[in-house]
Amino acid sequence: MKKFLKYVVPSVLAFALSGIYAIVDGFFVGNSVGDVGLSAINVVYPVVTLMQSAGTGIGMGGAVMWTVRRAEGQKEDGDEYVRTALRLLLLTSIVLTAVMLIFMDPVLSFLGAEGTIRPLGEEYLRIMVYGTTFQVFATGIVPLIRNNGGASFAMVTMIAGFGMNIVLDYLFVWVLQLGMAGAAWASILGQAVTMVGSFVYVWKEKLPVLGVCKEFGKKVCRIVQIGIAPFGLSLSPMISLLFMNRFCLSYGGETAVASYACIAYGLTIVYLLMQGVGDGSQPLMSLHYGEGKTKEVDRVRNMAYATAWVLALACMLILYMTRYDLGVIFGSSDVVTQMTGNAMPIFLAGLLFYAFSRITTSGFYATEQSLFSYICVYAEPVLLLILLLIVPRILRQDGVWLSMVLSQILTAGIACLLRQKEKKRIV
């Protein structure tokens, strides 16, 4: 238990802070620009999450293979996965920056940025794209640090970036009145602090950065194979956000979009807490898996389930009690605040199911069960889209809200079936 807490507690705290990190721009912009600014960030944020998810996926893929190979006694091969992951992070940063700058207009249209939302969304997104490298590396190196026993240091670097973001948001958005641009610059400079701190750790701890990468292409494929699941876990809430925004706009207008922005900000912290438990327990699961200790893997996973459920229950209680305060925090209108409070209980009903599927998925990719992890990750957005095409036709806007919960319940059912299949296969 002590070793479990040593890995999980710093990870949970770090992701809790990154959850607040994610809503800081919304807080400052919502209270400065108003509902339209809040909606603009909400609409374009899936692209920002795509960048960060790419870093998370590559970093986690490299970290899992590094830990497993070391546990199997193949140290040099494991070290090569670190070098491969870092080079892949750089390549991904360059490609994402170029693609997003070239296709900015069609991407904005695809995201549904229309009317008064579009110019504000473009202003925010363009600056965030300029900082792609900071975001990809800030999220990509952290899993490597955590798998090297540096969970506490990873937490410190994330706290430093978070603190910088708050200070700069206050300065740029409220004092200098730079609006959307100020919020974007504050975010990427905060990520730059985390990235620099991570490189300091890499240098001080002498992680295997320099040297050759034998079978580079093969290792890239293996990193991607493992990383698709954590990439999807980070991106999935934003895919869901994209779907929800489009259907909220169709059935409830800009008021529903602004309301879901408030709800999504509140739920983001919960989702990231679950990610903190899953990613925090991953190094131990990968280590025991590499050592062939199946019972230890199950023990760590069971502790992760219990921790995630306790956190989910606590968050459900807090969000329920403050459901009519969320809109006020983000400077929303009275209509948006009322709609947010009325809809929040529906979303809270799915959190325990989400916690189960999230930890189950982490266990799958930590033990190289890529197919099962893919199914768990991508089932939720696919099911959500199917439900959004059906349920709102009957229940209108309430059907949009309900579709999210139903998709989480069904995904948890799929995860449970796959978990049972895994147990039978091991036996």
Protein language model annotation of sequence segments:
Residues G59, I127-R146, T157-N165, A183-S198, ...:
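Short runs within selected transmembrane alpha-helices of multi-pass transporters and secretion channels
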Residues I23-F27, A98, G140-L144, I166-L171, ...:
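Alpha-helical transmembrane segments of multipass membrane proteins
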Residues M1-S32, P46-G61, M65, L90-T97, ...:
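N-terminal transmembrane alpha-helices
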